[in-house]
Amino acid sequence: MSSRENYVYNRNPVFTAPKNNKRRPSFICYAMKKASEIDVARCELNYVIQPKNIKTGLPLKRFRRLNEHRACALRAMVSAMLYHFNISSELVQASVEQLSDECGLSTLSKVGNKSITRASRLITNFMEPMGFVTCKKIWDRVLGNYMPKMITLTPLFFMLLDISEKQLINAKKQQLGWINKNLITKGLKPITVIEAKRRAKDIQMRNLFKYRISKHNFYKKRKNAQRLIALDEKEARQKILRALVAKYSISELTTLGPSGLKKQVNISYYYLKKIATNRYPDN
């Protein structure tokens, strides 16, 4: 095998739906079926659209065709984005990392560091300049860094699948009808397309904030556990003991007794050992 053939991991990436495998709207199912039938990587649009610099808007030098590795990545990525597409908000309800994992584009180094470069470059260096998606980064004031990109699918994206803008608009109207039917059933007023889009975006933003705070707290707890477990076991147990003594009241300590307190130290120590090696449970 030549070095050229061996320079990427997983030469045949395929999108695999997450375990929850939620039921998708009929339009999404239709679009995903089209994606399985059409070679989106060799679509005529890829040869006629002039890619542009996403910051300056100036034309970029274009290539005649995608190399086969990036073409394979694009085929998987299109299906993944469709699966997570919210018709009302026009947003992909998944992070680049999640899309990368589900497409088999992520890699792990020998020391366990994950890389999503292949997926990230596909989006940043091809899909965005071509106008198939737009991406927005939002600063997280709580954690002091950027949140995962908010990815929006454009009408051009659906043209890859031979789905017209009119079909996309009709799908939005159908989705809005379903939303309003549920609202009326609950005794609430129906909403407009613009309001439905705003609400869907707000929900995604709230969920993203909750996820990031949860993830931040998890890694903070894991870091503290790793610091404690790195100590000599006797010293670590003494620290746990002191923390438990400070936590419990005198009456609670009396009830526990020496054996009960020792048992709590054992439970806490092995719990911290488990936390120290756990990974965040991404979907």
Curated annotation (Swiss-Prot):
One Pfam entry name: IncFII_repA
GO terms, biological process: DNA replication; plasmid maintenance
Transmembrane segments annotated in the record for this chain: none
Entry keywords, A to Z: DNA replication, Plasmid, Plasmid copy control
InterPro entries xref list: Plasmid_replication_init_RepA (IPR003446)
Superkingdom to which the source organism belongs: Bacteria
Function noted in UniProt: This protein is essential for plasmid replication; it is involved in copy control functions.
Family: Belongs to the IncFII RepA family.
Protein name: Probable replication-associated protein repA1
Organism: Buchnera aphidicola subsp. Schizaphis graminum (strain Sg)
High-level lineage: Bacteria, Pseudomonadati, Pseudomonadota, Gammaproteobacteria, Enterobacterales
